[in-house]
């Protein structure tokens, strides 16, 4: 049967199965009472397989989109009564319900039931018993399963391609945290902004955009806290200083982060830290040059002080198989980066305090401090002399000189009710993994710390509506519901006795579906929707990078092509993932990235051809990276040693160029809605049961792209980022969806790439935005650029190489 595109939302319920038989047991076809008796004896005696644990899954062809909890001691007639809210963007002939028996390692198949996708397209509810078949589609005795399904096509969604629409937009549905009103959001590009970075960007109401300074604000927030300082991080390094700009000194600004936190704790402030306990995957990856997280150093530094620093492993939920538990605890991380403090009220005279939170992509560790100039060599005797970060070369060090690895990132400060949601996330995590009950009992301080309340009046044109999203499961957060019914009511996903918050992926999907004109993405990784990859050298169903974001983006573009409307997606990624570029892990990720790009460009190319449009696919979807190149200046830092000959290090040093590492996790939609957080566009971050993540989605209700383009803070932030990357501001940048804009940006980025990759160096690179070095053919194939098989100064393939030994779960 031909496959049909299911793009929308599927509501599915699995009620129960009847007359199941188990081909994997001698008693598998015996009457129910005999089977339960045998399994009960095995359980009691500890011999044999014990009680059968049965679960069911929902698949769209070979992509798993839903899974029930396990039912024990009901080998014949298990009853689940579980409902699923499934976002789908899949080609499928059937919705497949699979019934399985859980084993300590893996699972055994009982059978599958099929419902034709064709039957769902009308949108009516289907409630029926389906026959269960074996691998050959032969009936498994009288086995059957009772299901209910209803499909809602994306085109019939009242928010599809309509943007935020109005100030009454309620936020992303089916999530743990609801949208908060009356908030204030501060957006940060990079850890610091020097005084001479002054883009002239006009906003609505006659205002000009003003950049903000992340690490200065975090320093002030920590310094002024009186009751609590809560920090989570993938890495926290005690030896960094947050204030480094000699033109903007602060009293006490030369203190290290570690000393600052110890001082605040000694003053009676409750300082609690959850730092990822880097146990393992390091063993597999460290040889590839990935940086250490300093977790042991940080814990030892605070040992015996008033600071409570807990090394926090990524523990599995209680439900997985032995193999799954091993994967979670050894391969995945705690990736949230948050700071929560109590803060003075805006009117200085008050003794009352409020909660302020910071979230985003910037860890409080070495290698993160940078400005919009992203220098390679010129700060090596000043702010980066004691903070030299270069993990892409074997033996990279300040002694051998630059280029350092510049760092581009994005962060945010949240005030108002949303700040309390970040606090609650920390409290859930501390109660699960923090050990001692040291959380400040805020209800005991009602006269000091005010309860969640708006910080902006409803009529204030600068007010924000904000919603918090996460990727996290019950293994990392305390107090998750225990039953699927309660989980669904709480906006959580259940599956195989695991409760998951997967709302970051939901937020991206919703924002992409709402988009009207353009999307601008900056992210450290870009891979996923592996169910749509071409099966060249792989079996896509074995990759498991099932999140929808790349496919949703290409389907959005296709829908606009079919409607005869403009739409552009801009994506900025690093030149390669941090690490030695020739290494197996980096090459594997680049291979997944190439397959993702090719899937998207193929969708676009086919839509252009089907609609008789002759156009470059890069006019609709275009990828960039960031890089810098500097001529040598008099008085520059001179290293005492030199890199080894014939290495990437010496070649980059002599060519005086290197990538700017894009660590950002951000998406802007139509200049009216922004997502910022810790989550990458890969399966690790979007899964919910892998890396733990946090993000926020926000908009200004008085600055929506309804009748005219949005010109609030989000617009100003995007234009400031483009000024940082392109070194210019053009009127055409005000209309990113236009073909004139995308062609101008592509033209400038291609020129900068030519200057970056040239053998000659006559001047500093005038901007940092580089066209990602790939070719895109008319049919959507992604190819090497002529003469550019490898990245400059390396022997690393731009298109990557599939790894024969690293499991996909590690690199997706």
Curated annotation (Swiss-Prot):
Top enzyme class: hydrolase
Domain of life the protein comes from: Eukaryota
InterPro entries: C2_dom (IPR000008), C2_domain_sf (IPR035892), PLipase_D/transphosphatidylase (IPR001736), PLipase_D_C (IPR024632), PLipase_D_fam (IPR015679), PLipase_D_pln (IPR011402)
EC number from the UniProt entry: 3.1.4.4
GO MF annotation: an example: phospholipase D activity
Enzyme active site: 335, 337, 342, 663, 665, 670
Annotated SUPFAM superfamilies: C2 domain (Calcium/lipid-binding domain, CaLB), Phospholipase D/nuclease
Positions that bind a 1,2-diacyl-sn-glycero-3-phosphate: 335, 524, 663
Keywords on record: Calcium, Hydrolase, Lipid degradation, Lipid metabolism, Metal-binding, Repeat
Catalysed reactions listed for this entry: a 1,2-diacyl-sn-glycero-3-phosphocholine + H2O = a 1,2-diacyl-sn-glycero-3-phosphate + choline + H(+)
GO biological process: phosphatidylcholine metabolic process; phospholipid catabolic process
Positions bound to Ca(2+): 190, 374, 408, 724
Domain (C2): residue spans on this chain: 1-130
Pfam families referenced in this protein's UniProt entry, alphabetically: C2 (PF00168), PLD_C (PF12357), PLDc (PF00614)
Annotated ranges, domain PLD phosphodiesterase: 330-368, 658-685
Keyword Transcription regulation: no
Keyword Lipid metabolism part of the UniProt annotation: yes
GO cellular component: plasma membrane
Cofactor(s), names only, from the UniProt record: Ca(2+)
Annotated domain remarks: C2 domain is a calcium-binding fold, and the binding promotes the protein association with membranes. A lower affinity toward calcium can be anticipated for PLD alpha due to the absence of two potential calcium ligands.
Oligomer and partners: Monomer.
Function: Hydrolyzes glycerol-phospholipids at the terminal phosphodiesteric bond. Plays an important role in various cellular processes.
Family statement: Belongs to the phospholipase D family. C2-PLD subfamily.
Protein name: Phospholipase D alpha 1
